[in-house]
Amino acid sequence: MKTLPAVAGSLVGLLAVLSLPGPEPPVAPAPARGHGFAWNQDAFWRSLEKTYGDARAVGCRAADPVAARELSALGSAADRLLGTSLDPGAAVLDSVERRFFTLASFVAACPRHLGGYVRLSGSLREAIKWQSRRWDVAGDAARARVYRSLYGLRGAVEEVMLHHPDSVTALLDGRHEPSATPATTVHGVEIHSGDILVSRGGYPTSALIARGNDYPGNFSHIALVHVDSVSHVASAIEAHIERGVAVSTADEYLGDKKLRIMVLRLRADLPQLARDPQLPHRAAALALERARSGRIGYDFEMDYTDASRLFCSEVASSVYRELGVTLWTGLSTISGAGLRRWLASFGVRHFETQEPSDLEYDPQLVVVAEWRDAATLRKDHIDNAVIDAMLEGAQAGDALSYAWYRLPVARLAKAYSWTVGRFGAQGPVPEGMSARAALRNGAFSDRQSQIAARVTEAAARLTNEQGYPPPYWVLLDLARKERAASDRG
């Protein structure tokens, strides 16, 4: 009879030990060169909604000619930008940006010019990318200009698309950049070995990766393409949180939940490629060989200088760096105190790093094609707004908390995961992630999903009331309101 109390006492003692939280993870300081970007144009955004309402009121017969004139004028401006070098602070770039945003209101009201508006965005993106080749994109002025142009162009186009979801063209051509590396065609897009796929997953953590940046973006994941020179079979080399570096077929890559994908390619006129046109293929082959030669764990610390473990961006950057091409011209920075505290609780230790969204701004790369899932575009924008609102809360002191009694179970799950991992299996807690980090990750995802569900309902009601979907700044207002409500209750 004495055995039972002894066993019970031991179990209580074990539970108490497993429930001890331990010290909070260290939070690295903000990068010296980092600071958050802010548009500071709230009044202008609100005025665009009024312009849209006025255009609807006067009707397309009056609004269409205005849109046609601006499309033509901005198209001519894009042509001029491709031939005249400007400083990133040039006033003409501010003017083009503002006119493009204003034009969105007319095209949203009268969609006859939607196709032309989308093509114009591609022309302007090409012009800004060309301009940026001469800029110091690591400097504040150039970085802000490239960001507000490329991110802003996409945002304006998608606001228009959300007004006319049945007219959305999912696949948009970019620049047809020549390449000497092996190629294949996947869903109508010719991809070459060494191309880089930048995508956005459909999970709460995907939205956090995309938005958790001094320059909040649209993308959360990087994969490097390898095309076999004989069979022309395409593979994607990528790093997953759950299983580290892995090789996927094209179908497996596309089968994983994605809201958008962009294909990037090194410019053919780069000096490194002029000397060795097969350099991108050699980089892809090197990544493929390493991925198949042994397990490479996921780098939760986001240390882009250490190739012993890799996060998704490092899969591409590490092999290209070995061959003389340094990607992410101008490193990503994460400065917000609340965001750094949250990311540190997940295991991140480096806040000057390589964020997926920022690769688009590297002037060494061109956009070959861009695909977006029209059916989930609204979800993409709502997730962004919710994350932005949650990060405002983090900056104000919101913590990622979990019930204390879940910690012992999580630690046992971590021990189980470690054990099965020795035999090549995958447990519930990824290698390199602590039990507490896993609990906080789950708490974050649950809260984001709950707020997003309420914002989705509120946005649907507002759409029914006013006859058009709320723009992003209104979604952000709704997200702030729902976040505050969740804090209270």
Residue ranges and their predicted role:
Residues K2-G489:
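Cysteine-nucleophile amide-bond enzymes
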